[in-house]
Design a protein with these regions (language model features):
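Non-heme Fe(II) oxygenase metal-center motifs and adjacent flexible, charged/small-residue loops
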Residues: 2-306
Length: 306
């Protein structure tokens, strides 16, 4: 019989309070496309991660470089809640180590994603209604095969809470949530821009950092401009305007004494306008490989059967 999950499973209890006072049953988000039921935030944490409790500090505009438009919250999530959020999401979400093939110079190359990934959401042409995917305009059940390859997964409550708080603070709308887990300094993401056509012109992307501090590097695509931010736990960067079309960004590897940093989670909220966005995000963040979950005892990701 599965062990009953309580708040004790995620956060260390206080020695000054009775154990009974710490136990807070955790409900779950359910969907047929989930590999397992995903735990909801305990009520106390959900409240702490909702307005007016966040953002913790107002955002600061960074637009002093050519074509750059950022709103930097340092932090958006308070330190204690950022740590709780990191531990919770690492333990409760399904993760994947996606492999895919691309052609470079006419030669097919296999790419192994150097980080753990997962994704939830659905593009603007459709929406979830009672757990089923329907056309956004007609509300008729989608049966044209557009999502046959990867059944979309609705954003679970634990991420939906943060999505709503982000929308309230920024005035932007998001329908996708991508989560990256960098287990150590060896995990990284190379320079890239999120400028795919399915995001529309000048997309806005909210990017959260939880856990270990990592350097966030940016460089202009054509001009000799660059930026480096040391992102601490709870920080959020809102990238908007021409930032994606004119700039690249990356999280480089860390070596030496900083390589085993305890791990970092990156959450990005974005808005896909067409079904190509849904196909792309599930292909590169879930794929066809095995699913992994965090093992609290071994302190590592372990392959699980879906």
């Amino acid at each position: 019989m599965p062990e009953k999950r309580t708040l004790d499973a995620f956060f260390a209890p206080s020695a000054k309070r009775p154990r009974e006072a710490e136990a807070e049953p955790v409900s779950t988000s359910k969907h047929s496309a989930y590999p397992f039921d995903i735990a909801d935030f305990p009520a106390t944490l959900a409240k702490e991660l909702s307005p007016p409790n966040i953002p913790d500090k107002p955002g600061q505009t960074i637009d002093d470089k050519q074509d750059l438009d950022l709103l930097y919250f340092d932090p958006f999530v308070p330190k204690l809640q950022a740590r709780q959020l990191f531990e919770f999401l690492r333990a409760e979400l399904p993760f994947y180590r996606v492999q895919y093939k691309i052609k470079r110079g006419g030669i097919e190359t296999e790419i192994k994603t150097p980080r753990w990934t997962t994704v939830f959401g659905l593009d603007e042409t459709s929406r979830f209604k009672d757990g089923r995917v329907v056309d956004a305009e007609s509300e008729v059940l989608v049966a044209d095969g557009r999502y046959t390859r990867y059944p979309p997964r609705p954003i679970p409550q634990c991420l939906e809470t943060l999505r709503r708080a982000t929308e309230a603070a920024t005035g932007c709308k998001f329908n996708f949530c991508l989560v990256n887990y960098y287990a150590s300094g060896a995990d990284s993401i190379s320079y890239h821009s999120d400028d795919e056509r399915f995001l529309g012109r000048d997309p806005t992307i909210a990017s959260f950092s939880l856990g270990a501090q990592r350097d966030f590097l940016m460089k202009h695509k054509t001009a000799p401009e660059s930026l480096k931010l040391a992102l601490g736990s709870g920080a959020m960067i809102l990238m908007r305007g021409t930032t994606q079309s004119r700039w690249l960004h990356s999280i480089p590897k860390r070596t030496g004494k900083n390589s085993e940093d305890g791990g970092r989670i990156n959450i990005t909220f974005r808005r896909a306008m067409t079904k190509d966005g849904t196909e792309n995000y599930y292909n590169y963040n879930v794929g066809r490989g095995p699913m992994y979950r965090w093992d609290r005892i071994r302190r590592e990701m372990r392959q699980r059967n879906e």
